[in-house]
Amino acid sequence: MSEPLLRVVNLEKKFPIQRGLLKRTVGQIHAVDGISFDIAAGETLGLVGESGCGKSTTARLILRLLDPTAGEIYFNGKEIHTLSREEIRKERKDMQIVFQDPYASLNPRMTVRQIVAEPLIVHGLAKDDSDPAVDEMIELCGLSREFGNRYPHEFSGGQRQRVGIARALVTRPKLVVLDEPVSALDVSVQAQILNLLDDLREKFGFSYLIVAHDLSVVSHISARVAVMYLGKIVEIGTREEIFENPQHPYTKALISAVPLANPKQERVRKTSRIVLTGDVPSPANPPSGCRFRTRCWKAQDVCATSEPQLLTIGKSQVACHFPEK
């Protein structure tokens, strides 16, 4: 089996809690706590979970926008957090990101052509925004090259996100992190953007890590899905296995909340929808044992004393003492 493009091993990130004038450390926030996964070349992995589960922190660690507390991240066979500033600069052209907010992520004083050309210029791949690769990528992302001299405020949200996608893909990176790429867009535009991303992946062989809280978004383009809860991956598997045969109670609850397009099916399913009670525990003081046990209808004594490990069940890996049968 070939080496994966990205391999994450026992990754941890803890943020200190500091108080007082002397900034005394009184605790830690366990944002990411010992997660492992990999992404193959040309593959899309969806990372899903509720707000505060650590998925966006994971994305920032992978891009080396944050330094990990522990663990390793291998990209292109290199452990990125051991690379020098110059070495990581060379790798960055192969690691790009599409941001959540198409309004805030674009410089209002730059034209579309300048925005898309910027990564090429920074990495020494072009001298200015007249490079043919700029107009080519603008058109590949569904915009006319005539838009190149316009400014971001002249476009709709969906068009701005297309500009952001063109900027991220113009260097032909190997890995693209999609941080909630459609959550700020109208529902009518979301499918268009997701289809565009999938078409470009097939054309150029990009690998995607898509971070989202909406499972319907992840199911649209992901080959595999990892479900996070309170800093831990509780289940990871193929898209079909996760959505058709979820093993972890939390995964099952998330999927039961995804609305169906057919009104009749939606009315029938409402009777079996799983409603989680209680709030998500604080990452500064996570529960002992299984972190989901405080909201789980299957929890027993062993769940409080023993932390479940990821075990292979069928085509999935699940961390649960009492997985679905």
Role assignments for model-derived ranges:
Residues 71-79, 91:
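Conserved ABC transporter NBD signature motif
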Residues 177, 181, 185, 189-267:
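P-loop NTP-binding/switch modules centered on Walker-like glycine-rich loops
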Residues 151-155, 159:
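Conserved ABC ATPase signature
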